[in-house]
Regions:
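N-terminal capping segments
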Residues: 10, 14-61, 66-69, 89, ...
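Sec-dependent signal peptide recognition
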Residues: 1-7
């Protein structure tokens, strides 16, 4: 039974290209075109603005990025926008504990690796104002609000 549940959960997090809505697919297309480049002023929000504009998504400034998605109970998919507010993350290894805090940040879900491990596209991270792809473990979130949004077609 445990094996069945594990297989089911693994398969439920794999997304085929056919399952990605066209608006999300356009956002991923945009991210691929700007990796390693500075978007606008290099602020984290500028990346979301550029991606949503490129995808002709319907949204309201500053943070109405689309339909809110609860990542703990609903499926998240590449191209979803992530709003981070007062989030503390903590990861543990054999010899160390690493903590970091993001007061206010915007990122884009780029790829699902496995259950709760994701690749995100973001800029203005550690003073680097270029688009980069980083791995996050959503289980590392200890406090704060991590809100996902599903972009909507215009």
């Amino acid at each position: 039974m445990k094996l069945f549940i594990l297989i089911f959960l693994s398969l439920s997090f794999h997304i085929s290209d056919n399952e990605i809505p066209p608006t999300n697919a356009k956002i991923i297309e945009y991210i691929n075109s700007v990796k390693g480049k500075k978007v606008d002023r290099g602020e984290c929000w500028d990346l979301a603005n550029g991606a949503l504009t490129y995808a002709h998504a319907k949204w309201e400034s500053p943070y109405g990025f689309g339909k809110p998605i609860n990542y703990k109970t609903e499926k998240i998919i590449p191209g979803d926008i992530i709003l981070i507010q007062n989030v503390t993350m903590e990861s543990k290894s054999e010899n160390s504990i690493t903590r970091w805090k993001m007061v206010e940040h915007t990122a884009i879900l780029f790829e699902l690796k496995e259950t709760n491990k994701v690749m995100v596209a973001e800029q203005n991270v550690n003073g680097v104002r270029k688009v980069q792809i980083n791995e996050w473990n959503l289980d590392d979130v200890k406090s704060g609000t991590l809100q996902f949004f599903r972009p909507q077609a215009n």
